[in-house]
Amino acid sequence: MQKPPLLLRRPLPPKFTKLSLHEKKTHTAKTGKIESLHVAFTEDETTSIKMDRTRFPDVLRNQSLTPINIQNIFLDHCVQERVTAISSPQKSTKHVREQIPDTATGSIFFPHCNSASTRIFGKQTNKMESSRKFKTMKDVYTEKRLENILILSSKFSKPKSTPGSVIAQKLEKMHPKHQPLPESPGYTYQHISRDLSATVPSPPPMTVSMKPEGQWPEHFKSTATLTLRVTEFPGFVSLPTPVLPRKPHRQSVIETLVTENGNIESVPKQIPPRPPEGLTKTEKIESEIHVVRGEGFKTVAATRYETITAMTNLAIVNCQVYGRNALNLKGFFILNCPDLTPLAFQLIYLNLSFNDLHYFPTEILCLKNLQILKLRNNPIKEIPSEIQQLEFLRIFTIAFNLITVLPIGLFSLSYLEELDVSYNELTFIPNEIQKLRSLEKLTVDGNELSFFPHGILKLNLTKIQFENNFTHPCFWRDNYLNNPQQLTQIISLFIVQNKLHKFYDKIPVEVQKLLKCTSRCEWCHGPKFGEGFRVIRSCDIFGASQLPVMFYVCSPSCYRRIKESSFVLDGSPSRRIALDVELSKEL
């Protein structure tokens, strides 16, 4: 026998009161800020709600939403359940924009399912709605709480006035969206809900005793019932880190350094692994072939001067190892010069300025190829004549010392080009300076000089500096005052100039000693006995003006001639040096 085809439609619902034909009013809710409500829901909670005949449209959300799986929908059945409903008297519906309070926790569910009567008579209702003209609704903004919204929570105590009971059984889960309907009307419905646990912390749940409720009254039995069960719920949700107050850059750097230092101190010291005990003696000898052993100076236990001495010795070793020809020990404040014999044929430059050397360092004399020597700012009082051993010395600086006399050996340096003896205690310069025929620059500032010797006119100087001395013309008169000559000196000069000693065959020994000429006249270049007569003449030479030059002459006649002369010969007939006649007449 052929079975009639199954009808795939729902059974007719019980009779309802006649629906009014007025236009269905819709509720629209827009929220700009999520605020906390009083109740929330979690997993495995079954709740039902009384569905209004009006339906709620989707609510706009800016964040990701969690789907809710509705297991079964029982139509016109009385089931024991726990109901949480927030109801309010019906008012005229408009587009409503609500503010959700900040205390809202858990999840908020906005129903999107139509009532049973709407689903059954949906076609007729749609026709009636299409025949009516759509009216624009005004937007209304309110600060009141949202109404007609279901709030579900796993731990929630409903008010005593709300009818309902706890459901004792769990319904089966149905995953496919399109399946034949079973005897008990049920289907799977994906709905969008809002999870606020990621942004707002949940307060502790309220503990209110729940009492089982009795059966629903008759006027509630005609309502549609929704049984919800959450199957998918977000797992662990990380809360955003609180925004700390802004710190100044300097404070942040200090805290970072303190943290790093604490981490360094907390790190345990690494103990090097011990070598295996099974190594033989031959292996130890082979491993020690490439080991470099030496001793370094320790500044912790040593004094300051010992440290400085070690540094100077290290500098000498570096010059010796790397073949350096210059050694700079400037500003070490050493008391004694280190041993320079390892660099005897290597160094050509040595700087010992700004130290505490009280004596001229004789260790320098071993440097055979030394060309530049600087001893500036040391308390040296004397230069030894042995300095002539530095044959190739070209530049010699010994300024800001305590030198009183220039040795004769200094004028034996035939290659000397620059001589700086400024700011010492020199009272005169020997006439032997004329031997320095290579000298080009002479600096004698800050001494006690009143004049220069006659021999300086024989040099080929390009520059001379003599500031801060007693060379002004007002000091000349005190320096060239002459004493009368002795009678023996006058007679000796007369005998020698007239060659009278040749007329005598035998001359006493004492007279022979008196007739021996010890010096020459700087004007006539004849013999001069005794000190002679002194005279200062001003010269404009070597780029300087009024350079005072002292002349020692043999007789009053030479004294008168040099005073009246406008030039002087430097020993060679081809060279004449102009003299300032007017200045000499004033004196």
Swiss-Prot record:
Keyword Lyase: no
GO annotation terms (biological process): intracellular signal transduction
Signal peptide positions on this chain: none
Pfam family, one: LRR_14
Keywords from the named record: Leucine-rich repeat, Repeat
Sections of the chain in a coiled coil: none
Cross-referenced InterPro entries: Leu-rich_rpt, Leu-rich_rpt_typical-subtyp, LRR_dom_sf, LRR_domain-containing, LRR_R13L4/SHOC2-like
LRR repeat ranges, renumbered to this chain: 251-274, 344-367, 368-390, 392-413, 414-436, 437-459, 487-510
Record-given protein name: Leucine-rich repeat-containing protein 63
Top-rank taxon, per record: Eukaryota
SMART domains given in the database record: LRR_TYP
